[in-house]
Amino acid sequence: MGKKIAKRLQTLQAKVEPQKVYSIQSGVSAVKSLASAKFDETVEVALRLGVDPRHADQMIRGAVVLPHGTGKKVRVAVFAKGIKADEAKNAGADVVGADDLAEEIKNGNINFDMVIATPDMMALVGKVGRILGPKGLMPNPKTGTVTIDVAKAVANAKSGQVNFRVDKKGIIHAPIGKASFNEEKILDNMLELVRAINRLKPTSAKGKYIRSSSLSLTMSPAIKLDSQELMDMK
């Protein structure tokens, strides 16, 4: 880490009360006040859930289209042929192909942020799964990225779909906007994400579902949020 970045983080850390738990509204205000980079930083929420990802039925994974998008221009690649390939192109997909797209991926040409595939293409996609998987790009029915309706999937991706899943520690990290967004947009996006995660709560999960939560920017320390208030948001 460069000295300038380390100094900036130290300065920002001094603005945050490490043990303070912020209300949702004040937390959003606080995290926006920490914006200091020369670029428009991403606002990220981290939610630690009361699940054990080692159990298949508690592996939370899904997708949500944020009402105000993420603020990021998303490049979309689609594995499809024939009519479905035409539908994907007409919907605004940046890259559409089949064997040729797989070859591009094998050659390291991955200039896209999301991959969508029709079900009949999954055998082909599986051949590049070792490349796409670690990058979080592998299409999955749970995130709506393996589908016949490629036009809708492309539209969702372009309008701000966020794919999420718990990591090994039971934490979901997800972008919910940019530092330049007003507070209302960030709150709306966060509420939509929490609703989506709540809908996926497994019946086998015991105790409090959202154990802890925080907000941060790309270049800022984290702001602790009131998790109970977050769970009560409707």
Curated annotation (Swiss-Prot):
GO MF annotations for this entry? rRNA binding; structural constituent of ribosome; tRNA binding
Q: Which GO terms describe its biological process?
A: regulation of translation; translation
Q: What's this protein's family per the entry?
A: Belongs to the universal ribosomal protein uL1 family.
**Which InterPro entries does the record associate with it?**
Ribosom_uL1_bac-type, Ribosomal_uL1, Ribosomal_uL1-like, Ribosomal_uL1/biogenesis, Ribosomal_uL1_3-a/b-sand, Ribosomal_uL1_CS
One GO cellular component term, please give it. Answer: cytosolic large ribosomal subunit
Keyword tRNA-binding, does the record have it?
Answer: yes
Keywords noted in UniProt: Repressor, Ribonucleoprotein, Ribosomal protein, RNA-binding, rRNA-binding, Translation regulation, tRNA-binding
Q: What does this protein do?
A: Binds directly to 23S rRNA. The L1 stalk is quite mobile in the ribosome, and is involved in E site tRNA release.
Record-linked SUPFAM superfamilies: Ribosomal protein L1
Print the organism lineage. Bacteria, Pseudomonadati, Campylobacterota, Epsilonproteobacteria, Campylobacterales
Q: Which Pfam families match?
A: Ribosomal_L1
Q: What's the protein here called?
A: Large ribosomal subunit protein uL1
Q: Which PANTHER family does UniProt cross-reference here?
A: 54S RIBOSOMAL PROTEIN L1, MITOCHONDRIAL, LARGE RIBOSOMAL SUBUNIT PROTEIN UL1M
Q: Which residues cross the membrane?
A: none
Q: How does it assemble?
A: Part of the 50S ribosomal subunit.
